[in-house]
């Protein structure tokens, strides 16, 4: 928001929710994402980059309309993006008074993603920022089974009207040459996703070798989520389908990212299933997808979650969005996010070993005669170093089949360079 003190499009290390509030403004999307990240895991190094609203963007809005006649005093519990707002209700009072009090309660919480305006018997909630992400804000009553005061009826509409996400192109340019192991992407429109996927491919490629994995989330029906998954095909992007969760998709993506990266950085080959996503609220029981429905989503490039005892949301299977090869044939090569994570880890370990052991060495052919102490390395020496590294990775459970690797490994000088 405009209250943020940090310049736009400038990456900054963030260590706490309070710091995020100061840097990016209380109630901003980035503040909410970072607060969720630090609550889920405060030890993962996290950087943030703020972007401006699209100048042509519109803000999403929703309405709570009151009707009936309250016959018993109580409390009205409204949830905006999974965050509760409580409002006192007095038996027999005018509904306009309840609406005014509800709007005041919403505006009293500056961390909410919305502001409120009362008019007669209705309260209009408006997202603090412009863009499509505002349409994904959930608005409902009684998430945890609270009771609405007898006689009072509160009807919530869906958030609509948000248009035009920020253009991620400038943010991508601000990435620089730094390697970001996990990137949280809140904007899932086709244009922004295409731009990000292109950048990820460049970083994955041989010239940069600074691979990253992007984490996104999508809110919608089973059909809408399936369609979104089938429209993408990147092995470096994973998208969690949230269903009708009260928690916004951008929070899902942030918590999913920090949880997954904390595990992948420790052991990229270890599956992520059953890892809890702290602070994420599951859909209501009737809205949860069945196993058969989740299986459909997995085949459409959408990662799935499970709900454990106590309504704890956890990763079920973290697949990438990659589904078909260049011939449009089904290809499971990069099915799980662990595959690109493991490949990236192996490449990084290999580069690090060679750069550490032979940082400024001259390259000579095997059998070359040179004096002691010369900073010279030969293909056979490098081959031996790679085999030793593979043994270490094998002991760490990252790779297997050492004998096959040894037989297949060829290290030779480039005749043309």
Regions found by a protein language model. Give the residues of each.
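Structured, hydrophobic secondary-structure cores that serve as assembly/anchoring elements
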Residues: 1-45, 274-288, 292-417
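Extended, beta-strand-rich, solvent-exposed assembly scaffolds of outer structural proteins
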Residues: 16-24, 69-140, 183, 201-202
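Short, solvent-exposed secondary-structure boundary motifs
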Residues: 29, 52-59, 102-111, 228-229
């Amino acid at each position: 928001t405009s209250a943020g003190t940090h310049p736009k499009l400038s990456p900054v290390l963030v260590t706490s929710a309070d710091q995020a509030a100061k840097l990016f403004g209380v109630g901003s999307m980035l503040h909410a994402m970072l607060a969720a990240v630090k609550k889920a895991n405060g030890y993962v190094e996290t950087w943030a980059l703020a972007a401006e609203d699209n100048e042509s963007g519109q803000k999403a809005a929703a309405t709570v309309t009151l009707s009936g006649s309250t016959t018993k005093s109580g409390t009205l519990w409204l949830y905006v993006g999974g965050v509760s707002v409580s409002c006192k209700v007095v038996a027999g009072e005018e509904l306009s008074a309840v609406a005014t009090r509800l709007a005041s309660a919403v505006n009293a919480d500056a961390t909410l993603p919305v502001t409120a305006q009362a008019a007669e018997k209705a309260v209009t909630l408006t997202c603090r920022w412009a863009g499509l992400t505002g349409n994904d804000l959930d608005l409902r009553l009684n998430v945890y089974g609270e009771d609405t005061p007898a006689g009072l009826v509160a009807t919530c509409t869906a958030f609509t009207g948000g248009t035009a996400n920020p253009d991620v192109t400038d943010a991508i340019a601000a990435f620089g040459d730094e390697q970001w192991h996990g990137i949280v992407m809140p904007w899932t429109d086709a244009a922004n996703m295409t731009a990000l996927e292109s950048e990820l491919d460049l970083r994955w490629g041989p010239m940069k070798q600074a691979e990253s994995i992007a984490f996104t989330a999508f809110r919608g029906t089973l059909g809408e989520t399936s369609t979104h998954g089938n429209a993408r095909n990147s092995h470096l992007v994973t998208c969690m389908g949230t269903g009708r969760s009260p928690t916004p998709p951008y929070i899902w993506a942030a918590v999913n990212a920090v949880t997954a990266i904390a595990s992948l950085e420790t052991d990229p080959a270890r599956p992520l299933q059953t890892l809890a996503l702290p602070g994420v609220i599951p859909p209501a029981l009737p809205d949860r997808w069945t196993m058969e429905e989740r299986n459909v989503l997995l085949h459409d490039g959408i990662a799935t979650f499970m709900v454990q005892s106590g309504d704890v949301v956890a990763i079920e299977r973290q697949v990438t969005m990659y589904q078909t090869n260049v011939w449009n044939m089904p290809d499971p090569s990069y099915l799980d996010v662990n595959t690109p994570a493991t490949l990236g880890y192996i490449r990084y370990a290999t580069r690090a070993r060679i750069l550490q052991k032979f940082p400024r060495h001259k390259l000579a052919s095997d059998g070359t005669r040179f004096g002691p102490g010369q900073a010279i390395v030969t293909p056979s020496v490098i081959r031996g170093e790679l085999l030793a590294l593979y043994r270490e990775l094998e002991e760490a459970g990252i790779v297997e089949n050492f004998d096959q690797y040894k037989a297949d490994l060829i290290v030779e000088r480039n005749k043309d360079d």
